[in-house]
Each structure stands twice: as C-alpha cells, then as structure tokens.
C-alpha cells in the first residue's frame, strides 16, 4: 500500500485523521497548540504503543514550531525566532551538564546541509573552560561534531557520535538534521523538536543507524527542518486536492527516479535556518543575550 511520506509527527497525525474522515480523538496521542514569541507551536505527544502504531513513530514528545512568519521579515523576526527555538531546546534538555551538538548531513548537498550549517553557529566552550577559567568558568561545556556522511568518510554518523559520547559523557546530545515534509508549505517553514532521537539522512531518503537513548546511552534531542518533499507524496496530495483520480502510486513509488522537491532558493533558506537553530541552541544553553552570542561568534 502506498504511504504518504513525512518525517513530521504533526503531519502523521493529520494523515491519520484524513485516512477515514476521522474526527474522534486518537487514543494514545495528545495534541496541543500554543504560541511562543508570536510563532505557533503544535505539540504531539505519543503516549503508548497504540499511539505509536497509529502514527508510525516512537513514543515521546514532538513539537513543531511554525516559522512561516520568519520569512516575512517582520519586526524582530530573527531574535524572536531564536528565542522560540531556544525555548523548545530548554524545555527538552537537562538544565546542566556537558552538551554535544551534532550537525548531521552532507554540506555538499544543499537540502541536506542544515545540520552542518547549524553546527557552524554553535558557541564551542568545552576546551575554553579549562584553558581560560577566569573568562569561561560560567559557561556550560559544549562541543560540536559534523560527522559528514558515510559515502565520504567511511564511518557511520552513529559510530562517530557514539565514540565521542563515550569520551565526553554529555548529559544530552542535540542532533540537527534535514527532514522530509508532506506539504510544500512546511518546507523550510517549520522546525520539529523530538526527545525520541533521529535516524540520520531520513530527510533525503538515505536512512542510517539511529541516534537515540538506546544506541548512545544518553538522551537525544532531535532538531529537524523539512527541506524536501517526496515527489510521489506531492503528486498524490495535489491530485487529491484537485478532485482528480490518483494514478497507480505504487508504480510511481517504485520508479528508479526517486525524486525529491526543494525550493529554488534553498541555499539561502538553509543558511538562515541553520543560523537560527544554532543561535537558539546557544541561547538555551548559555546565559547570554543574542547580541552577546553574535559578538562571541563574529
């Protein structure tokens, strides 16, 4: 059976409701909405195995931050987006202890570069706390890793991260990666936060070993940005919205040309979102204002 592809829990919840015109509450799943810094946040909590089976995702908390208004460049748009991202990170990570930030993805493949770009904006402090305690003793120890991809390194991201976790003993791993969305309107306009971990490369259809509590032994906060839409899923949705009969989607899915759709200005969008996510993580982990973060990174 053809399944519409999405990495977003909010869209998996939508698909369940659409599957048979369901309007009743889904057992094992709780969904709530709120606004932070003017940006909408939808939280989907998968509570048990029934919820896991319905949405096809592991139990945990999934929060989707809608940054559509970010691209309108309104008053204080960047600072508000940074604080909105940072607030989610604060609520889903421990208050103290070392942190390892992992920028997953292939920097040479633009839709997959959001992880490495976010890591570029992380304030690295682990080595400075011991070297210059008079200046950095009040900072939280933070290290960053850009593990690259298996095809260019010969090493699975999970293997590289596991080695560092064994060495650094972080209180949490924050993994940033690209995702796939069902809808074009959510591409580069949403950020998903999940305390269940992540499978590197899932956004561009290149699934690798998972990064989660079971594989690493420490909590993993996944921060994902949808940068692509699966072409078969997009086709099915457009035909459905137009009231036209669907083609043979199994045949379409089985074609060797596994196409992904991405915006034409994806270069600028992933750069902007990488910076917002990196700054948001800094804001959550360090007792600094955004202007101070900017000064330390410049």
Feature names for model-found ranges:
Residues 50-94:
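An N-terminal, well-structured beta->alpha segment
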């Amino acid at each position: 059976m053809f399944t519409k592809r999405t990495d977003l829990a909010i869209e998996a919840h939508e698909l369940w409701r659409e599957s048979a015109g369901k309007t009743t509450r889904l057992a094992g799943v709780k969904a709530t909405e709120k606004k932070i810094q003017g940006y909408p946040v939808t939280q989907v909590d998968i509570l048990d195995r029934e919820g896991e089976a319905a949405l096809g995702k592991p139990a945990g908390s999934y929060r989707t931050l809608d940054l559509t208004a970010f691209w309108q460049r309104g008053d204080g748009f960047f600072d508000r987006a940074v604080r909105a991202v940072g607030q989610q990170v604060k609520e889903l990570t421990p208050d103290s202890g070392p942190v390892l930030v992992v920028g997953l993805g292939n920097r040479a493949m633009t839709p997959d570069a959001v992880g490495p770009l976010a890591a570029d904006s992380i304030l690295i402090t682990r080595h400075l706390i011991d070297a210059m305690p008079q200046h950095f003793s009040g900072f939280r120890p933070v290290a960053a890793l850009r593990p690259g991809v298996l095809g260019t390194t010969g090493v699975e991201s999970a293997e590289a991260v596991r080695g560092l976790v064994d060495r650094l003993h972080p209180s949490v791993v924050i993994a940033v990666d690209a995702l796939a969305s069902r809808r074009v309107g959510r591409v580069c306009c949403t950020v998903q936060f999940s305390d269940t971990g992540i499978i590197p490369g899932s956004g561009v259809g290149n699934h690798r070993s998972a990064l989660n509590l079971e594989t690493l032994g420490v909590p993993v906060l996944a921060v994902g940005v949808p940068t692509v839409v699966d072409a078969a899923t997009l086709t099915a949705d457009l035909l459905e919205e137009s009231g036209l009969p669907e083609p043979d989607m199994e045949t379409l899915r089985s074609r060797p040309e596994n196409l992904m759709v991405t915006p034409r200005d994806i270069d600028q969008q992933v750069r902007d979102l990488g910076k917002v996510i990196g700054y948001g993580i800094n804001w959550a982990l360090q007792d600094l204002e955004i202007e101070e973060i900017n000064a330390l990174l410049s």
